[in-house]
Amino acid sequence: MSATPQVSDASFKEDVLDSELPVLVDFWAPWCGPCRMVAPVVDEISQQYEGKVKVVKLNTDENPNTASQYGIRSIPTLMIFKGGQRVDMVVGAVPKTTLASTLEKYL
C-alpha cells in the first residue's frame, strides 16, 4: 500500500481546500491498473516535494461525492489545488517528469 495519506469526502475541505501548501490529489480506485502504475510516481513526488507540496490520495469508489464534484470521469486523475481552488490537472498515468513540471508552475 502507498505511503501517501488518504483523504475522504469528509476530510477533503480541511486536508485539501484549507491547506497552506499547494496540494496534489491523486483520484484513484483499487481496481484501476493505471492507478497502480502511477502510485509509485505519486509517492516519489510526495518525497521529492516534502514541505513544498502536500500530496494525498482519494479513493473514488469510497468517496464518490468529491470525485463527482470535480467532474472526475477517468482515473487516475491528478489535480493540483492552491488556495482552495483547482488550478491544474493531469489525467492518466504520466511520467514523473510530466507531473513534476506541472507542479513546479505552482510553487
UniProtKB/Swiss-Prot annotation:
The keyword Transport applies. The gene is trxA. Residues 2-107 form the Thioredoxin domain. GO terms for molecular function: protein-disulfide reductase activity. It comes from Synechocystis sp. (strain ATCC 27184 / PCC 6803 / Kazusa). The keyword Kinase does not apply. Belongs to the thioredoxin family. GO terms for cellular component: cytoplasm. Disulfide bonds join 32-35. It comes from the Bacteria. NCBIfam families: thioredoxin (TIGR01068). This is Thioredoxin. Keywords: Disulfide bond, Electron transport, Redox-active center, Transport.
